[in-house]
A protein has these predicted regions:
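A short glycine-rich, Lys/Arg-flanked "PGG" loop and its adjoining helix->strand segment in the class I
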Residues: 1-14, 42
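Conserved Class I S-adenosyl-L-methionine
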Residues: 5-6, 31-54, 66-68
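Generic detector of short, locally flexible boundary/turn motifs and exposed helical patches
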Residues: 13-16, 29-35
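Conserved beta-strand signature within the Rossmann-like core of class I S-adenosyl-L-methionine
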Residues: 15-23
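Short "lid" loop at the C-terminus of a central beta-strand within the Rossmann-like core
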Residues: 23-28, 56-57
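SAM/dcSAM-binding transferase cores
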Residues: 39, 63-114
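Short acidic/glycine-enriched loop/turn segments that link adjacent beta-strands
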Residues: 59-61
């Protein structure tokens, strides 16, 4: 509910983030649920965006997540010094981080209608 996301907003510090599952955009009922959820979050948080991951064990394999914050933009505020930390991961890198927020056109269209 909008009240729930309002409570999340109140609970977060200025540097806090909220992440939630936004379902699969592939199936009409899930896409509608994603739109309704994103609309509620956007009405509460000044920064609200969507990112994606491909998870083969999930229905359709294409899954969306919501990102919301009072002050932090997940791409613009990405600290590039991550690359200088010398952390070796099998999956994560800053290019992938930015790429997760690049959405296919059909998802952009769903979000434009919110």
């Amino acid at each position: 509910t909008k009240e729930f996301y309002g409570d999340c907003f109140k609970a977060l510090k200025s540097s806090g983030i909220m992440v939630n599952q936004h379902e699969s955009p592939y199936y009409p009922n899930d896409a509608l649920a994603m739109q309704e959820t994103h609309k509620k979050i956007k009405s509460v948080f000044p920064i609200a965006t969507v990112y994606q991951a491909h998870i083969p064990t999930y229905a359709s394999g294409h899954w969306l997540f919501g990102f919301a914050s009072k002050n932090l933009d997940p791409v613009a505020d990405l600290k590039m010094n991550w690359n200088s930390l010398g952390l070796k991961t099998k999956y994560y890198n800053t290019d992938l981080h930015k790429g997760c927020f690049a959405l296919p056109n059909y998802v952009k269209e769903l979000l434009n209608n919110v």
